[in-house]
Structure formats: structure tokens, C-alpha cells
Amino acid sequence: MTIINRKTAPALLALALFGGAAQAALVPPQGYYEGIEKLKSSDGDFRCEAAPRPYTGSLRFRSKYEGSDKARATLNVASEKAFRASTKDITTLEKGVSKMVGQYMRDGRPAQLDCALTWLGTWARADALMSSDYNHTGKSMRKWALGSMSGSWLRLKFSNSQPLAAHQAEAEQIEKWFARLAQQTVRDWSGLPLEKINNHSYWAAWSVMATAVATDRRDLFDWAVKEYKVGANQVDEQGFLPNELKRRQRALAYHNYALPPLAMIASFAQANGVDLRKENNFALQRLGEGVLAGARDPSQFTAHAGVKQDLHDLKIDSKYAWLEPWCALYHCVGDTLERKHDMQPFDSFRLGGDVTRVYDPGAESKK
């Protein structure tokens, strides 16, 4: 018989009552529980293309900024072409899975789900993207692909329609592969000096966060939160990221590019009882407001970066997909809310697809 000291009994009771809550299963934001929009029984004109060849080779790719100076802001057309060619199968997988999952969540056609599972299963069985021979561009592709795949997977895993219920063996194999990729991503992006931590680290943290929730891995969740805090504390009082200001004419574009992963991480953290909104005096809010102001009038970015800004990316609506999680965190009003509505829907394969359906499912009815 176990004897419990009266002094320790209350503590043990508290642990029993609240300890489980502290380690509750990880969950995504509420929108990921949405079911299939309108179930269609036939396969329609959907045809499953053959899965792209699993990429198991060396992750050494040319950078599209090859030959550029330290600012890494001048595009090398020949290098970009070589990069696109060598990473084509990876990008085809990312975009294809995102598209098929989106189609399935809209129409519920079994062939759409089966095809997405076939593609992911083919790569999982090959243990693709796990090469230990990589350069910076290669490890960047690994984490981008993981974020795309895990982000899409969350819509299947948590949907009230339970599409994976009849595919548990396949799902387990795919999720184990995601977990291996996430563990490697943690190794790839850990321990960097502050001057080397920029948007790449934030995107790595997003991929790990998405995988943490998909696989219920608290260690991965904690790492993503830790990396988020590093990023948030890089935002200065005026809302600038010093390491992105180094990108010269693309400083504003890279500030904008840093926002999607940070906003998604904060949103996922909040869903699990970790409120990151106030980190570094509301850094994420400050960063977003600065980018929105810069998109209207880039003069402050021009002054801080020391060169006129390239606004090409700032004219593409999908580049503002971060507004969905950001507005869910900070409750946008007025001009910001109007701008968000004007640009919806937001579809970003690197965030797992249609983020408007996740965060603002009634958006279409507002138009």
C-alpha cells in the first residue's frame, strides 16, 4: 500500500487535475476543423497525375541570388533557371498536394484524397528530402517543402469530416516522415548567430510548428515557439527587422515575406494556450503595421535601407496571406480590414493552401 504524506497530497492532487492539461494534445486553430464544403459523389473530371519522382539526392542547389553582393538582392536569371529546374519535382509535390487537398476539402471527391495520399506516401516511403549533404539553398527547400506539406496535412487530419479515418496506416507512415524532416529541420536551423537569423529561420520554425501539431510533438512545438521569440525580439521599436533591411532594394519585400511564418506560429501557439502577441511589446503587430504602411508609402523603408524599394512583390495579393492569421490575432478594423477583404481569398501553398477558408470562412459571402 502506498502511503501519501498529508503535506504532499494537495500537490499531487493538483498535478492530477492540471498536469494533464499542461500536456494536452496539440491542436490547430479552429478553422482547421472545417468539414468538406459540398460533398460530390462522382470524381468529375479529376485525374490523378503520376507522383513526381521522390527527391532523394543531394540538397545542393544554386541560389537565385548567386553572384550577388552581401545584400543578396540582385536576381541571377541563369542561376534561378537552374534552381527551378533542379527543384521542379519538389515544388510540383508542394503545389500539387496543396491543390488536391484544397479540391478535396471543397468537393470531397475520394479520388482527390487518394491522389494526395499516393503522392505523399510515395515520397515518405522513399524517405525523400532527408539528405545530409546540403547547402543553404538545399536546407531552405527542405523546410519550405515541409511547411507546405504539413500545412496541407493539418486540413485533412483535423477536419470534422475525418478523411484520414480509413487511411490510418498511410497516414502514420506519412506523419513519421514529416517528423523525421522536422527533426532534421531543427538541426539545420538551430544555433545560428543572431546576425544570421532572418526570414529563413522563421519559415523553418513555421514548418516545425505545423509538423508539431500534425504529429503531436511537444518538443517540436517548443522549438518553434523559441525561434518565434528570437524573431520577435529582432523587431526594433520602429517595426524594422535589421537583418531584412540588409536586403537593400528588397528590404520591404523581405519584411513582408517574414510575416507569414511568424503570424502562423503565433496563431498556432495561441490555439494551444501560448499567447505570443505581446512578445517584445507587440512586435508582430508592429511589424505588420510597418509593412502595410510601407506598401502605401515606402519612403521609410527607402530611408532605412538606403535605396529605392522594389515594389513588385508588394503588388501581388497572395503575398499578404499573413493578414488572415494576423487579423485573427489582432482583430483588424478599418482600412486594414478593408484591404484584407479586397485581396481575399488568400491561397498560399507554403502555408498549406487556402488560409482564408481556415481563418475567415465567411469571406465569400461578404463580397
Curated annotation (Swiss-Prot):
Enzyme class: lyase
Subcellular location: Periplasm
Record-listed substrate binding positions: S63, K64, H136, T137, Y254
Matches recorded under Pfam families: Alginate_lyase
UniProt-recorded Gene Ontology molecular function terms: poly(beta-D-mannuronate) lyase activity
Domain of life of the native organism: Bacteria
Main location: periplasm
EC number, UniProt record: 4.2.2.3
Reactions catalysed, as given in the entry: Eliminative cleavage of alginate to give oligosaccharides with 4-deoxy-alpha-L-erythro-hex-4-enuronosyl groups at their non-reducing ends and beta-D-mannuronate at their reducing end
Cellular component terms (Gene Ontology): periplasmic space
CDD domains cross-referenced by the UniProt entry: AlgLyase
Gene Ontology terms describing biological process: alginic acid catabolic process
UniProt keyword terms in alphabetical order: Lyase, Periplasm, Signal
SUPFAM superfamilies: Chondroitin AC/alginate lyase (SSF48230)
Signal peptide range in chain numbering: 1-24
Protein family membership: Belongs to the polysaccharide lyase 5 family.
Function comment: Catalyzes the depolymerization of alginate by cleaving the beta-1,4 glycosidic bond between two adjacent sugar residues via a beta-elimination mechanism. May serve to degrade mislocalized alginate that is trapped in the periplasmic space.
Record-linked HAMAP family: Alginate_lyase
NCBIfam families in the cross-refs: PRK00325.1-2, PRK00325.1-5
Protein name from the UniProt record: Alginate lyase
Organism (species): Pseudomonas entomophila (strain L48)
Taxonomic path: Bacteria, Pseudomonadati, Pseudomonadota, Gammaproteobacteria, Pseudomonadales
Gene behind the chain: algL
